[in-house]
Amino acid sequence: MKVAAATRNPNKLRAIREAYRTFGFPAEVVPVDKPPGAPPQPIGLDAVAKWALERARHALAAAPGADHGVGIEAGVVEVAGYHLDITIAAIVDREGYVTVGTSPAFQIPTALLHDVLQGRELGATAEAHYGRPAVGYREGIIGLLTRGVVKRIDLNYAAVLMALTPRLPHNAPHYRKA
């Protein structure tokens, strides 16, 4: 199976490959550039989901031989007055069938929140605050906060696993293709 992913981030590419393999779908993951106009940090659940889906559709269109397009987008959501970072994965196939999954979410440190709510990417804000370059391509902010117990790849992997769940053969009868 050929899977196009709208990212060049090795962390996301590895998470996609591992999630597909976990469910028995051997996948060749092909990176493509992200779609134009993607915001540095989507804010709100709908915005995060929209850009995950935009990435998935863009990836599929950019790779004519691909069976699936995958988009992974992280962003900020507010829940009961708390701001959380969440990752959403969207998968689209050639028939237009879309499945979506999320990662666990974590509370964004208040020291970073102001800049993030002003539209600055959480990764860039964390890099400046913690003095750790390219954190988004490594352990992610969650890796810094948990001292490596949970890493960004874990969140990406979980989101892709959840997006793949409706596509498992035993689940197909329980989901309606849109």
From Swiss-Prot:
It comes from Pyrobaculum calidifontis (strain DSM 21063 / JCM 11548 / VA1). It catalyses: XTP + H2O = XDP + phosphate + H(+); ITP + H2O = IDP + phosphate + H(+). Its EC number is 3.6.1.73. It holds the Pfam family NTPase_I-T. GO terms for biological process: nucleotide metabolic process; thiamine metabolic process. Phosphatase that hydrolyzes non-canonical purine nucleotides such as XTP and ITP to their respective diphosphate derivatives. Probably excludes non-canonical purines from DNA/RNA precursor pool, thus preventing their incorporation into DNA/RNA and avoiding chromosomal lesions. Its cofactor is Mg(2+); Mn(2+). Homodimer. GO terms for molecular function: ITPase activity; metal ion binding; nucleotide binding; ribonucleoside triphosphate phosphatase activity. InterPro entries: ITPase-like_fam, Non_canon_purine_NTPase, NTPase/PRRC1, YjjX_NTPase. Keywords: Hydrolase, Magnesium, Manganese, Metal-binding, Nucleotide metabolism, Nucleotide-binding. Signal peptide: none annotated. Binds 1 divalent metal cation per subunit; can use either Mg(2+) or Mn(2+). This is Probable inosine/xanthosine triphosphatase. It is an enzyme of class 3 (hydrolase). Belongs to the YjjX NTPase family.
